[in-house]
Amino acid sequence: MDKIPMTRAGFTALDDELKTLKTVERPAVIRSIAEAREHGDLSENAEYHAAREKQSFIEGRIKELEAILSLAEVIDPAKLSGSIKFGATVTILDEETEEERTYQIVGEAEADIEAGLLNIKSPLARALIGKDEGDSIEVKTPGGERGYEVVSVRFV
């Protein structure tokens, strides 16, 4: 399988989530299941079924995180330079609204647009890859085509 590019911060966040699921969440849900079993008939025991559903979610997320972390390739953006690539922190200017936004281009597993972490596979990130300060790009969005200018590129 292909390696999954990831920043150190993204790797640490996912690893911390995995540890919490294994050491806190999993034992708590096991206790909840045991307590619900004590209430008798399992066929109509809502607490039991809710706890089992939560256990299923936790186990699924643990498997997902283990798979992601086993394929992670941690990339240190501070060691990079040049045009926009994975790990770059990019400030862009929306040519229509004159609004500046800053994003760091990261892997899928750590992307969070609200936190300024832009998925490398997103249309905006794909349009930015390979560009330099001062370049302009056009991006197709659900609301139509948008133009942006690259204001700055940093590797931190």
Curated annotation (Swiss-Prot):
SUPFAM superfamilies: FKBP-like, GreA transcript cleavage protein, N-terminal domain. Residues 46-67 form a coiled coil. GO terms for molecular function: DNA binding; RNA polymerase binding. One of its GO terms (biological process) is DNA-templated transcription elongation. Keywords: Coiled coil, DNA-binding, Transcription, Transcription regulation. The keyword DNA-binding applies. PROSITE patterns: GREAB_1 (PS00829). NCBIfam families: greA (TIGR01462), PRK00226.1-2 (NF001261), PRK00226.1-4 (NF001263), PRK00226.1-5 (NF001264). PANTHER family: TRANSCRIPTION ELONGATION FACTOR GREA. Necessary for efficient RNA polymerase transcription elongation past template-encoded arresting sites. The arresting sites in DNA have the property of trapping a certain fraction of elongating RNA polymerases that pass through, resulting in locked ternary complexes. Cleavage of the nascent transcript by cleavage factors such as GreA or GreB allows the resumption of elongation from the new 3'terminus. GreA releases sequences of 2 to 3 nucleotides. Belongs to the GreA/GreB family. This is Transcription elongation factor GreA. It comes from Cereibacter sphaeroides (strain ATCC 17029 / ATH 2.4.9) (Rhodobacter sphaeroides).
